[in-house]
Amino acid sequence: MSVKGKGFPLDLGGSFTEDAPRPPVPGEEGELITTDQRPFSHTYYSLKNDGIKNETSTATPRRPDLDLGYEPEGSASPTPPYLKWAESLHSLLDDQDGIHLFRTFLQQENCADLLDFWFACSGFRKLEPNDSKVEKRLKLAKAIYKKYVLDSNGIVSRQIKPATKSFIKDCVLRQQIDPAMFDQAQMEIQSMMEDNTYPVFLKSDIYLEYTTIGGESPKNYSDQSSGSGTGKGPSGYLPTLNEDEEWRCDQGGEHERERECIPSSLFSQKLALDSSSHCAGSNRRLSDGREFRPGTWREPVNPYYVNTGYAGAPVTSANDSEQQSMSSDADTMSLTDSSVDGIPPYRLRKHYRREMQESANANGRGPLPHIPRTYHMPKDIHVDPEKFAAELISRLEGVLRDREAEQKLEERLKRVRAEEEGDDGDVSSGPSVISHKLPSGPPMHHFNSRYSETGCVGMQIRDAHEENPESILDEHVQRVMKTPGCQSPGTGRHSPKSRSPDGHLSKTLPGSLGTMQTGHGKHSSKSTAKVDSGNLHHHKHVYHHVHHHGGVKPKEQIDGESTQRVQTNFPWNVESHNYATKSRNYAESMGMAPNPMDSLAYSGKVSMLSKRNAKKADLGKSESASHEMPVVPEDSERHQKILQWIMEGEKEIIRHKKSNHSSSSAKKQPPTELARPLSIERPGAVHPWVSAQLRNVVQPSHPFIQDPTMPPNPAPNPLTQLVSKPGARLEEEEKKAAKMPQKQRLKPQKKNVSAPSQPCDNIVVAYYFCGEPIPYRTMVKGRVVTLGQFKELLTKKGNYRYYFKKVSDEFDCGVVFEEVREDDMILPIYEEKIIGQVEKID
């Protein structure tokens, strides 16, 4: 049963037409039917063979790329060819559609000659080397040479190497036509396309749009491939169709032309806008109350046009709108309405979601096909193995050198740390941290530091050296003298730890104030001495100087204050201990003790100053009043603090040199009071800047830190002090000596009679740095100091000139500053000091 007429092939290539035949009835797949002649008033297809009998099977559209000519029922769909194009360049060039799409891309990039030259070389190589075709091969070789190789401005000629050009030229001139004469040039062009144009093509808009719409976009050429069908139909997504409108071919053409003008980046946005306008139009029609029922079209969806990448309206609207149009309550129960007849939108949400999923499965409009990432061979795979091995070896050697350098650096750092730890081990063999053994009581954040100091005095601590506290002090002084290099303490630092030898606690301290006997016997003196000697905390062998000269309070006032402090019964914990240590360290860091030996002997003399009568107390008050300064502006107050700090430090050095003190006086002084005022409590014992520091705890203790204009100091030694003018120091010392009573002046000489004499193997080094008015002072081991050792003391490295003061009769003044240039030269000594000037070389 066949008739002659205008027929059209059934292979539509996945395109949709309104005249497409329906799928056959099961069991009649092999029956041949004829296509009826129909008038196509608005069709897109150009029908070619008029009057030719066209007999086809309506079972399955023919697919010439398959073995059987069609896809068997139940078989899985193969990978689309446009996804195989991303595997390699050869996969792209083996497919006709891929070649057309790639050529279109190259034409847009003005480099289509690359692909033409590649195919020309392939065709030339396939020519049979017969004698009859020699002339044809020669003409073809000359044409390829003139069009692509000889033209120096062409893109192919620019990509071919000069050696390859000369080889092809020689072959053409000598007429030695070889089928492989263009192979080298073809490989160079192919390599260039694989590295440049092919990856760019895979990321281009034309390829991405082609894969997104399921391989329909580029089929608008006049020369279609064999698998593309013979007709030119609408390609890509179908336009959005509202419920009350009818789709027309010319409307689809308008949408198609509009889509071609839209970039691929804006294509998805247009779909979203179309979808939203569709929903808005549906809601508008519902609100107007119009009822539209297009008819009873209940045929199932054509399975041959399902899952082709069409993205029409949303899934629920596409399927459920058809079902709702058939019902009588389509206007009141439409799912596009947010209220759904007054039912809250959150009710039966799971049920609606399930229905939406079922509708999606029924429509078959799942997500768009997945585009796999392109897998390319590594670029280094074409490298010569010898070059690759050489480059790899050089890189591995570089890595090995870096690792060896890191290992050497780590070893050096370990040695430096071991040396530092060895120095620390010589000083403290068994450190005892009091703050770690204290019971955890409730923290007291707001209290005066003197209360914590008093609580520390009131403790009973048992020591391994309980019967001989002088040995602790002697050993401590010897250890500190061996290692003078350390940092001076301050309130800004952490709480220093106890480094007394074998000074561990036999039992933890109680949470409140310890009770002590109120008698004036020997046991009271011992226990009190133990407390102070056990609480000598040091931060890396630091000297602590306790200022205890000046006036004291009357005895009645001291008794009243001590009674009040005992009645407060505040807990002694880690926080209070830290505050006490910080307050003591502040007074000690100011350098207020006469010398280091005096500060150590102070711990054994708990109540030495309590013997003074009211007359001496008044004298001390007047003396302390003479030290107080009037209220001055902030800058002048800072400078005054610095000057007073310098003078006090120099007084301590002079006292340390002139007097030999002993710590044995700690035993000989009988205590008269248990609770004695400490240096911070006594009004005459604190200098004006210390009093200001106690009033304003926020300010740092170091005077230089308060002034941001001052340069930062290097880390000083424990004996480091700033040097001031000798005349001012001597005058201040004479004034103090004149005011001090005779008995008090003789006391320092009586203290350290039994103490060992301090070795004098250190020398003072002071230097003025780059014209600064205040010199830097430090102590260096040994009496012989070279210029190289002096340079190590400088914290700022650079090109300097070094001048040192020495005695000379060359000038009237008797002294000169001599320049020293060699690092091994010994520096001159002037008045038991090395005084130098460091000047920067411009």
Curated annotation (Swiss-Prot):
| Chain segments carrying region Interaction with GSK3B | 348-433
Q: Matching InterPro entries, A to Z? A: Axin-like, Axin_b-cat-bd, Axin_TNKS-bd, DIX, DIX_dom_sf, RGS, RGS_sf, RGS_subdom1/3
Domain DIX span(s) in chain numbering: 760-842
User: Known Pfam families for this protein?
Assistant: AXIN1_TNKS_BD (PF16646), Axin_b-cat_bind (PF08833), DIX (PF00778), RGS (PF00615)
Query: Domain of life here?
Result: Eukaryota
Write down the CDD domains for this protein, in alphabetical order.
Axin_TNKS_binding (cd11582), RGS_Axin (cd08707)
Coarsely, its chief localization is cytoplasm
Q: Return the Polar residues bias intervals.
A: 34-46, 316-339
Query: What post-translational modification information does the record give?
Result: ADP-ribosylated by tankyrase tnks and tnks2. Poly-ADP-ribosylated protein is recognized by rnf146, followed by ubiquitination at 'Lys-48' and subsequent activation of the Wnt signaling pathway.
Chain intervals for the UniProt region annotation (Disordered): 1-75, 218-242, 277-297, 316-344, 414-451, 482-532, 543-562, 615-637, 656-675, 729-754
Compositionally biased spans, kind Basic residues: 543-552
Q: Which GO terms describe its cellular component?
A: beta-catenin destruction complex; cytoplasm; nucleus; plasma membrane
Q: Where in the cell is it found?
A: Cytoplasm; Nucleus; Membrane; Cell membrane
Q: Does the keyword Transferase apply?
A: no
Q: Name one GO molecular function term.
A: identical protein binding
Q: Which residues form the signal peptide?
A: none
Keyword list (alphabetical) reads: ADP-ribosylation, Cell membrane, Cytoplasm, Developmental protein, Membrane, Nucleus, Phosphoprotein, Ubl conjugation, Wnt signaling pathway
Q: Where is the RGS domain?
A: 88-211
Task of the protein: Component of the beta-catenin destruction complex required for regulating ctnnb1 levels through phosphorylation and ubiquitination, and modulating Wnt-signaling. Controls dorsoventral patterning via two opposing effects; down-regulates ctnnb1 to inhibit the Wnt signaling pathway and ventralize embryos, but also dorsalizes embryos by activating a Wnt-independent JNK signaling pathway.
Q: What is this protein called?
A: Axin-1
Q: What is the lineage of its organism?
A: Eukaryota, Metazoa, Chordata, Craniata, Vertebrata
